[in-house]
A protein has these predicted regions:
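Active-site neighborhoods and metal-handling regions in enzymes and metal-associated proteins
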Residues: 1-170
Length: 170
């Protein structure tokens, strides 16, 4: 919620990154768990787009991918939001990705294979006409490190187990 109050058109991605990381430290984070991603406008579709000097504009969708260490554990959070009213096509794509994310979260149960869980999100996005844009794995385990097993991907057979903590990232 904090970031929605400070993200404004006219600031750079780097400036927004600095505000986000400063807030994490203020709240008790021991440091970031990986390099913070802030990608706006046309850069928002980059799966690992590091923050740049690009100026955030009205109507831009902004993707934040960030995490912190707290009491020895890592977090990994991705959020996407708009500055003002986004282009209707971008809003449609956002809603498709959100629905795929929610479907995968609902399907994430002990015993499901990583491959089958990945297919829940990937198949939905493909049916909506955007399968070629899904170039990333579905997610990964998280805990003492930001990237742990299991890997949730279309070519991974391992199954989720009780108490796995995983990210769902489409």
């Amino acid at each position: 919620e904090y970031i929605l109050t400070v993200a404004k058109s006219g600031m750079t991605e780097q400036q927004l990154k600095a505000k986000l990381e400063s807030k994490l430290l203020e709240l008790g984070a021991e440091g970031t768990s990986f390099s913070t991603i802030v990608a706006s406008g046309h850069r928002g579709a980059l799966p690992h787009g590091v923050a740049s000097d690009k100026i955030i504009e009205q109507g831009d969708m902004i993707t934040l991918d960030f995490g912190a260490y707290y009491q020895g554990y890592a977090s990994d959070i991705t959020r996407t939001f708009a500055i003002g009213e986004p282009n209707p096509k971008l809003k449609e794509i956002y809603n498709i990705v959100l629905a795929a994310n929610q479907k995968a979260i609902e399907a994430a149960k002990a015993g499901i294979s990583s491959k089958a869980l990945d297919a829940v999100a990937r198949d939905y996005i493909t049916k909506q006409g955007y399968g070629e844009a899904f170039g990333h794995s579905l997610g990964h385990g998280i805990g003492l490190d930001v990237h742990e097993g299991p890997v949730l991907a279309k070519n991974t057979d391992s199954a989720l187990q009780v108490n796995n903590c995983v990210t769902i990232e489409p």
